[in-house]
């Protein structure tokens, strides 16, 4: 129950994201992923996404040494993604998936595990953003590299 309350407290309404969309502190992560087609999320991102969104590729970042799919990444791989994406500890991270379904949860927990405090979930996901006819963009975006992230993990969040 505490986890559900925590997630609910970390939802952001599309209209509120729209207001802060251009803030330099805001980093938006497109986490769309589909079990039946691992490339579909990226293709959808490339076609249309929320302005300034960065694609979060779970297949690239996951721990490749695990026999199980999509396990938490090794620290160095996660740190590379964070730095490459221009994210730092002061960033306001907004994550979304296709419909606010389940994949956002994995990414939210991942960022919490690595010590990020300001992580929000777009309420309703990309589906609601698009339904409201809010601004979209297409293509890939250039990202400013940052070296400001120092890894802090919270292993007490993981049970083996």
Regions found by a protein language model. Give the residues of each.
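Cytosolic catalytic domains that perform sulfur/thiol-centered chemistry
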Residues: 1-160
């Amino acid at each position: 129950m505490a986890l559900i309350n925590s997630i609910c407290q970390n939802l952001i309404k599309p209209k509120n994201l729209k207001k802060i969309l251009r803030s330099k502190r805001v980093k938006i992560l497109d986490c769309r992923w589909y079990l039946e087609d691992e490339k579909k999320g990226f293709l959808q991102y490339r076609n249309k996404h929320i302005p300034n969104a960065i694609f979060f590729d779970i297949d690239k970042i996951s721990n490749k040494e695990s026999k199980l799919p999509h396990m938490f990444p090794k620290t160095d791989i996660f740190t590379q993604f964070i730095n490459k994406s221009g994210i730092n500890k002061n960033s306001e991270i907004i994550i979304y998936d296709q419909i606010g379904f389940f994949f956002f949860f994995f990414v939210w927990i991942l960022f919490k595990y690595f010590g990020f405090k300001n992580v929000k979930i777009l309420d309703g996901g990309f589906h609601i953003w698009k339904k409201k006819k809010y601004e979209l963009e297409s293509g890939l975006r250039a990202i400013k590299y940052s070296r400001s992230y120092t890894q802090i993990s919270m292993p007490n969040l993981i049970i083996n």
